[in-house]
Amino acid sequence: MNVSKYVAIFSFVFIQLISVGKVFANADERMTTFRENIAQTWQQPEHYDLYIPAITWHARFAYDKEKTDRYNERPWGGGFGLSRWDEKGNWHGLYAMAFKDSWNKWEPIAGYGWESTWRPLADENFHLGLGFTAGVTARDNWNYIPLPVLLPLASVGYGPVTFQMTYIPGTYNNGNVYFAWMRFQF
C-alpha cells in the first residue's frame, strides 16, 4: 500500500473516533434531560391520572391459533399516575398500573412515559401523541422477576380523556402484543 492509502484509512478511523465522542456527549445530554423530566413530573405534576386497561391483542400472524384461543385479551385492572404538559405541549407521565396478562395473571408495570403531541384540528382539545415509555414490569411466567421495558407509545385524545397504546415486539408465539388503555386526567 502506498502512503495515500494509509492516510485515507487513518483519516477514516480518526473521523469515526471523533464521531463516537460526539455521540456519547449527546447521550449524556439526553440522559440529563430524561432525569430532569422525570424529576419535574414527580415534583410538579399538573394532573392526576386514572388508567383503565382496555384491550390486549395478540398479532394473529405471529401465533398459533390454539395459543391465541387460550389467551386473555380483555385485561382488567387499573392504575394511577401523575402527569404534566411541557412548554412545547408534549406530555410527560409517571404511572403504576396492574392488569390481567395473557395468562390471566396479574402483571404490574410502573414507569415514565413521554409523547410528542400534535393538535391538528382547530379544536385544541383533540390531540395525537407519539413517544415512548421506559419502566419496569414483572410477569408470573418469569417468576415476577423485575424486567425493564422500553416501548413505543401512541395516543389519540380529546380533552382529559386519552386512548393510549403500545406494541410489545417479539418472536413467533411470544410477544407481538398490542396493549391499550384509557387515561383519564384530573
Swiss-Prot record:
The record marks Y172 as: Role in the phospholipid gating. It comes from the Bacteria. Its EC number is 2.3.1.251. HAMAP family: PagP_transferase. It is found in: Cell outer membrane. InterPro entries: LipidA_acyl_PagP, OMP/PagP_b-brl. One of its GO terms (biological process) is lipid A biosynthetic process. This is Lipid A acyltransferase PagP. Its main location: membrane. It comes from Shigella flexneri. Residues 1-25 form the signal peptide. It holds the Pfam family PagP. The active site is at H58, D101, S102. Homodimer.
